[in-house]
Structure formats: structure tokens, C-alpha cells
Amino acid sequence: MSTSAAPGKLATTLGANVSSLASKVRSTSSTQQSLMQSVKRIIPPLSSAKHKGQAGRIGIVGGSRDYTGAPFFASMSSMRFGCDMSYTICTPEAGNVIKTYSPDLIVNRLLDASVEWSQVERSVDELFARFHAVVIGPGLGRDEFMQKCAKLCIGLARKHDMYLVVDADGLWLLQNEPDLIKGYKKAILTPNVAEFGRLCDTLGIDCKQEPDSAAKKLAQALEGPTVLEKGPVDRITNGKEVLYVDLQGGLKRCGGQGDVLAGCLGTLAGWAKIYQDENPTLPARSTTTDGDLIAEDRLLLLAGYAASVTARTCSRLAFAKSKRAMLADDLLPEVGRAYEELWGDVQALL
């Protein structure tokens, strides 16, 4: 009797486990669908009634003597994803090169070490007043002058209450001076594995602990900024909630893919600013679900999620065509295709 009961119990147990697994799968799928719908609510609809710039004016701070490709990829990605205007702010020698890449680029060669610092401050401040969001880091470099420029730009972003993305060598500055960004809730940082480890070391966090805990503790230590930790699984956290992106991307790990993500994130951050301006009564905080209005503390969380999903989709589409020969430049034509695959045809928003 016991032998006949055992298979029945086993079947019951297996059935319960399968049911539980199916429930988790449905829950995950439901969560993803909910996140995607929330992101759509931030995207400004296209309209013939709008004028140039109303769908986003984004600044990209980067481009130095040694690096001209990164700001190009970030600027082009921001426009391909949907912002109206993208401005590259760089050194004169980098600007001369970047200008030749595309007539669509607006290149401001304001980071000039040969002029008075007060002139640099004034020129950048005047330009920042136009932006919805700014990305600091692609092609920035680590020399003293460029790091000084990054410090200036972070301060100006805070002065103008602007949404801010800090990437690449902008994170090098923050690992040395984390107080520059502490407490600023309109910032999102995009560290890769090495950059995440250095930031954790600076702030006294064990980066080898359970991954969710490490990411949340870094965001908590920064007291406001959102963190998009890039890796095999991307984690986006504001210190309270953690979102995950594990979509399959391309298998080629060529340089420049992070710049594509940063550019898309810049546009999404700009759209978050537009959404906030159009809805001045946004709640400051929310639960993990979005009501009639998306709470302010979830805007960059959703932007980071959307940028990660988009970058991985671009990489997958580009890799399917180019395989081992894939370069970052191959991702640019895929940004618009990724947008439509993820967020739907543009006509659906008209």
C-alpha cells in the first residue's frame, strides 16, 4: 500500500512544483508586460502640432583627443531612438573629427583648455539650459582637464535640475569624488563589472556579495541616484526595487555597445523630464506598481530598464546579420527596428 501511495504522492508533488514554476513564469511575464506598458506611458507621442525639440534635447558630454567614436555612437543612438536633437560637447580637436561622421550631429567644441576656464563654464552653462537630459562620459578620457569638465557638467546638471546619465569615464570621476553625485535623485549611473567594483570599493561595499544586495547597497550608499549595473544580467535599482534584464543580446562583445545604451538612456531620461514637466503633480514615491501617474522615483528605474532591453535587442539584431564581424556601428541601424519590436509601431502613438 505504501509503494502504491508513493507514486501518487510523487505525482502530486511534481504537479505542485510544475504549477508553482508555471505561476512564476506567468508572474515574470506579467511583470515584464507591466514594465513595458509603463515605459510606453513615458514616451511622448508624435504629433504634427509639436515643434522641433519638444521630443527631447539631449546633451552628450565626451569626446577627447583619444576618443571620438564613443560620443558619436551615443549621440546617434539618442537620435535614432527618438529624441529630436542631440548635442555633442567635446574638445576642439575631437569636434573637428566628430563633425565629419554625420551631418545630423550638432557638435559644440566648448571643452577648450586654451581659453579661460570662466569662458568654458559660461558657454557650457548657457547650452545646458536648453537640455532635457545630459549624458556625461562617452569618450571623456581621464586626463585632468576632461575630468574637471565632467565635474563642472555634473554640477551644472544639478543646478538646472536636469536628468543625468553618468557613463564610462564619468564614473571614473565619481569613484574618486562620490559626493559629487550623492543625494541627486535625477541621476542614473551605468557601471560595467569593473566600474561597479571600483564604485563599491570607494563606498565600502562588498561587491562579491549576493548580486541584488550589492547593487541595492551601492544605490543606497549614493543616497538618491539609480544604478544600472551592466553584466550577464543587467540590474537596475534605486536602492529599494531591483529590475532585471536578461534578454539574449549578440555574442560579439565589441566596444561601443555601452555607448549605444547610454545614448538611448539619455533620450529616455529626457522623456522622463518631459513627462514630469507635463505632470507636475507626480507622486514622489510609489509602490512597485504604477497608478494613474508614474511616481518620480520610478522614472529613471523604467528608463534604465528600457535602455537595457533596447541595447540588447539592437545587439541581437546586429549580430544576426554580421556575426563575428559585428561592430558598434552595426547597431545604429537597428535602434529604430528595436524600438518598433519592443514598443510598437510609431503610428500606434499618433
From Swiss-Prot:
Subcellular location: Cytoplasm
Keywords on record: ATP-binding, Cytoplasm, Lyase, NAD, NADP, Nucleotide-binding, Phosphoprotein
Record-linked InterPro entries: Carbohydrate_kinase_pred_CS, CARKD, Ribokinase-like
YjeF C-terminal domain residues: 35-342
A single GO BP: metabolite repair
Catalytic activity entry: (6S)-NADHX + ATP = ADP + phosphate + NADH + H(+); (6S)-NADPHX + ATP = ADP + phosphate + NADPH + H(+)
Disulfide-linked positions: none
Cofactor: Mg(2+)
Sites where the protein binds (6S)-NADPHX: G139, N192, V193, A194, E195, F196, G197, R198, D259
E.C. number: 4.2.1.93
Record GO terms (molecular function): ATP binding; ATP-dependent NAD(P)H-hydrate dehydratase activity
A single GO cellular-component term on record: cytoplasm
Binding site for ATP: 230-234, 249-258
Family label: Belongs to the NnrD/CARKD family.
Protein purpose: Catalyzes the dehydration of the S-form of NAD(P)HX at the expense of ATP, which is converted to ADP. Together with NAD(P)HX epimerase, which catalyzes the epimerization of the S- and R-forms, the enzyme allows the repair of both epimers of NAD(P)HX, a damaged form of NAD(P)H that is a result of enzymatic or heat-dependent hydration.
Family annotation (NCBIfam families): yjeF_cterm
HAMAP family associated with the record: NADHX_dehydratase (MF_01965)
Name of the protein in question: ATP-dependent (S)-NAD(P)H-hydrate dehydratase
Lineage of the organism: Eukaryota, Fungi, Dikarya, Basidiomycota, Ustilaginomycotina
